[in-house]
Amino acid sequence: VDDDELLYSGEAGVQLTWMDAKVGDWVVTPRTGKAVEIQALWYNALRIFAALLEMNKEKAAADKMNGKAEQVKTSFLNKFWNAADGYLYDVVDGDHKDASLRPNQLFAVSLPFTLLEGKQAHSVLKIVEQKLYTPVGLRTLPADDNRYVGVYGGDQLKRDSSYHQGTA
């Protein structure tokens, strides 16, 4: 847990999220830092833990967890909202903010405790539907991204290098 109460994970050469494709020493989708879906899961874990504490009549501990969850939400909104594009950054690592449009941000609006509301949530859903939704599933990158690979096939190198680069 970082000073801003968000979770930081990973290190150079290591993949810790579901987008874990690696070819030799090459990390195809580097996501070191604060991944959007990890923050959404963290926020929900804190809120659920607080609810369990309340059910067990541990009000002081529940208040502490809810306070931590509010800090997470505040930090998340300050660091992850990409106002220029109307959706969430995929990963934040210090001053670097990865603006790749990926489906990972759906966790922030689809779990029981959402991190976005109103216009922001609507914007995320609208853009994901327009750019990532297909009749057979969600793309992991939009077709207009220069890294987009629409077909998963070929030898091991081609498959691994295309794995999380758009194929639905």
PLM feature segments, named:
Residues 60-61, 138:
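Flexible, glycine/charged-enriched surface loops at secondary-structure junctions
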Residues 38-59, 107-118:
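Well-ordered alpha-helical scaffold segments within catalytic/enzyme domains
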Residues 1-35, 71-168:
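Extended glycan-interaction surfaces of carbohydrate-active proteins
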Residues 63-67:
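Short, charged, amphipathic alpha-helical segments
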